[in-house]
Amino acid sequence: MSTRKLNRQQRWRIDKIQEERIARLARREARAHSLLEEGGLAGERPGLVLAHYGTQVHVESLPDDPQGPCLQRCHRRANLPALATGDRVLWQPAALEDGIGVVSALLPRRSLLERPDGHGHSKPIAANIDQLLIVIAPQPTTRDLSIDRYLVAAHAADLQPLLVLNKRDLAEAADLARLDRYRHLGYDCLSLSARSGELDELRQILPGRVSAFVGLSGVGKSSLVNALLPDIQQVTRELSSHSGLGQHTTTTARLFHLPGGGDLIDSPGIREFGLGLLTGEQILAGFPEIASWRGRCRFRNCHHEHEPGCAFVAAVAAGELSQERFASLRSLLADGDAATDD
């Protein structure tokens, strides 16, 4: 198949976009240097990224910082990779309280949840998290394939997944049966209701950990956050006053400190969590009950479709593997599309 040639106008547009991107990076770096030379920045200190707003991030000082508490918007130096909520960084606060600081270095991450952007590049969602809370609800319905995407992403990032059925008061038998199917596969599952306040089981697993909510818009992630954090409106107003954005913005992940210890990251809704950054082996590993059959096929290059002697197909036919899970695996292995935001 021949490569489509770009016409002159298309090449001009691509070059112009690239020039504008380079110019923006140069202006950002020049601004950081200007602040430093003018004495507009304080000394370097470690910090935590609470939220990400376009080209700026919201950073707070760590609890044990000898220089005391500080919370500011910051630019990111042009030589740094994209930052994520939950990142630990080195930063220089602005000397003025309402100024803009600069993030000068990214500290090593112990984990990173990421997905492809519209161009197939890495888009960090949250960093340094311990467990991924996959929130589903009777309405809107989350497909099994979407749940499996999150489970694969959690496995690839070495995160502990937990399936959370919210709006339990609206759940039907089919919703509870699906939860039981995943519980039978070995996944931890909870059913609860933010509306009725039945959150004791959830509260027990949050202290001492960094957790992240993921799931479709409308499944009640924000309602769960509001129930867990009675003072959430006050915290949100403080963040909004610094960012200049509204209180109900759902386009960015935000980190909140829990009263009982631990942190919680609330992420925006995602229709489909893309796995285009993962290899086929990584996707297969995210289905542990199926991956255990690897190496039993007659042919080493088996595609697990219609080849004779395929151990996977035989196990499904014998009822030893879930037909639905095997269909999800085949779909994900064939899917190279990037994720799309709600």
What are these regions (language model features)?
Residues 221-237:
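A conserved segment at the C-terminal end of the G1
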Residues 211-213, 218, 222-226, 254-255, ...:
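Conserved active-site beta-strand-loop modules that form the wall/rim of enzyme catalytic pockets
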Residues 87, 145-152, 176-180, 184, ...:
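Solvent-exposed alpha-helical segments within well-ordered globular domains of core cellular machineries
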Residues 142, 171, 198, 271-274:
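Catalytic P-loop NTPase motifs of RecA-like helicase/translocase cores
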Residues 1-155:
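C-terminal effector/interaction modules appended to NTPase cores
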Residues 153-159, 182-184, 292:
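Arginine/glycine-rich "motif VI" loop of SF2 helicases in the C-terminal RecA-like domain
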